[in-house]
């Protein structure tokens, strides 16, 4: 019966060892290169392994997969885990496992990721390979059982795939110029180029380009008339009918015969975007990103470009002043640091101050008379710019019963002008009630001023006799303890014009009014021949002598000018004033006080016959010393308000 059964069974082929079948291996090598090599296999599965190479690693993986298959078969009976019947395709690009029935792609393995392949010594038909998983970056071993062939034939076919892949890689390196430089000292290597897998069309294009480059090389070596061979001398391959023809000279400029020129975008796409076209100055030498200095916002090229491209309309015209001498600057510094100011906020309560600023308003007239707020200039000027409006107070806490002296003090004399008003207080101003003792620099400056004054002749001012018209009373600003400014008259009358205020070349001294309306007149003691300590002693010794009356000054004594009294709370005053010229054609009173007590200014100076004209500085100093010493009303909050001081200047 056994023989009868064996007669119906399929007879097995006679076993021929692999070493005696070299003709089959040759066909496998050709099939791998053409991509037509395939083997029917049973895919056992894959497991994770610890190493990337070794036959023992592959054998252990096969044992594990076979043991799992037996375990499931015995536990579940016929429903155990079976090996999948599939077809293994081997090519120079990779290994692909396709299901025999469903034609599904089970495994698609790149040949470059395969690190090791080997047959199994325990199972003749077993074959496995180790690869690196692209997602988990772990070593995975895939195991197969060949159906018709042995594991050695499958391993040989995969080895042929390795060789074909290596040949392609070396060919690409030669074409695209991939170079690897190894540094033994740092145990590193640098690779240049790309190993990207190219398509058949790209490969044909590269072959054509290589032919053109070789032709151009031959033309250079032969030293023909033309520097290069014209493109298109080689017919394009049939597989690439649309292959572009490139100029070989452009490629030879790179000095690399193996380099393949890239396709570049058109010039329109390479142009810069619109956001950068607006600032062409960024590419110049003045770019802030090219210099090592500090970055200033106003000097940025983009800012300067915006200023030039979009000019600001309705700009305010600025008139530059005359150059100042060193002596005038010294006198201004001395005036700013030595002029005391009474504390106006401690003696009387104040209501809310209202500051009116009209920087570009035209000059107004009241009842046909020019405003008393004109700023006089020392040179002819036809353009009339706007004056600076004075701070206005609703109520005057210092307004008492007006008398003749107060009216004369409040009147605007010849040469009245305002300093330039700014949004912040001038740096030369001190806080109200601040006292300052002269320093060594002040004493040195006084000594230098004395020596200069002794050498230079005194400048005389020609008397001006303007006509004063009785103006209507106009309510302007109340008198308050001012920051005293000084002016200096020129020797010729000039028309009344208004220009931005200039700083004087010389600042003379002025009378100093206090809170009760009684001023300290300017000192008139000669300063030649006395020491600075004596000068300080004279000033501080006679500072407490008030003056009951203040006679009107004659135009012949026009060096001494009285300025309008304005608010100290507005913090917009400046102690520096420019030279004044002459009287206004109108006058005004403060707080509605009539100026009927003013004496007409067109009378000449009354000098007794037979006597020389007295210098106004000496006359006022003598008048100051002759008065009895009194104390002003002390402030309840300011302990220094009763000690009034008089600042003086030395005329150069």
From Swiss-Prot:
Q: Which InterPro entries match?
A: Numb/numb-like, Numb_domain, PH-like_dom_sf, PTB/PI_dom
Question: SMART domains under this entry?
Answer: PTB
Q: Which residues carry this modification: Phosphothreonine?
A: 102, 242, 437
Q: Where in the sequence does UniProt note compositional bias of the Low complexity kind? A: 227-251
Q: Domain PID, which positions?
A: 37-173
- Which example biological process does GO assign this protein? positive regulation of neurogenesis
Alphabetical UniProt keywords = Cell membrane, Developmental protein, Endosome, Membrane, Neurogenesis, Phosphoprotein, Ubl conjugation
A single GO CC term, please? Answer: early endosome
- Per UniProt, the ranges with Basic and acidic residues bias are 213-223
Q: How is it modified after translation?
A: Phosphorylated on Ser-275 and Ser-294 by CaMK1. Isoform 1 and isoform 2 are ubiquitinated by LNX leading to their subsequent proteasomal degradation. Ubiquitinated; mediated by SIAH1 and leading to its subsequent proteasomal degradation.
Q: What SUPFAM superfamilies does the annotation carry? A: PH domain-like
Show the PANTHER family listed in the entry.
NUMB (PTHR47368), PROTEIN NUMB HOMOLOG (PTHR47368:SF5)
The record's subunit annotation is:
Interacts with SIAH1. Interacts with LNX. Interacts with CDH1. Interacts with TFAP2A and TFAP2B. Interacts with RALBP1 in a complex also containing EPN1 and TFAP2A during interphase and mitosis. Interacts with AAK1. May interact with DUOXA1.
Q: What is this protein called?
A: Protein numb homolog
- What is the species listed in this Swiss-Prot or TrEMBL entry? Rattus norvegicus (Rat)
Q: Which gene encodes it?
A: Numb
